């Protein structure tokens, strides 16, 4: 089974922090063979108060998804992500088919 991050967040409020997160994320994502699929269309909100965007990140395994999140290099990147927007990140195991 594959591992996933599901990131649900409000619209980006700090573009500079988001750009720094993206810069730091690239080598980390490559290290863990992550593939992301940011939604270009806002999700249809049916049972929540606020959700501006959804990103699905696919990993080869649940262990890889957890290890990536726990990687010290991601700690630095995460600071910028949390500065850029208010978000929720869930880690789960499954098979969603083609994510990218």
Each language-model region and where it sits:
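Short S/T/G/P-rich N-terminal loop/turn motif that feeds into the first structured element of a domain
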Residues: 1-53, 60-70, 93-100
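C-terminal structural segments of small proteins and small subunits
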Residues: 66-70, 74-90
């Amino acid at each position: 089974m594959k591992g996933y991050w599901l990131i649900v967040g409000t619209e980006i409020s700090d573009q500079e922090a988001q750009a720094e997160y993206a810069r730091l994320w690239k080598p980390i994502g490559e290290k863990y063979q992550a593939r992301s699929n940011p939604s270009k269309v806002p999700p249809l909100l049916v049972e929540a108060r606020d959700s501006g965007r959804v990103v699905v990140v696919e990993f080869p395994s649940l262990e890889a998804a957890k290890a990536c999140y726990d990687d010290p290099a991601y700690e630095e990147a995460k600071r910028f992500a949390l500065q850029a927007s208010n978000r929720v990140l869930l880690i789960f195991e499954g098979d969603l088919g083609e994510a990218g």
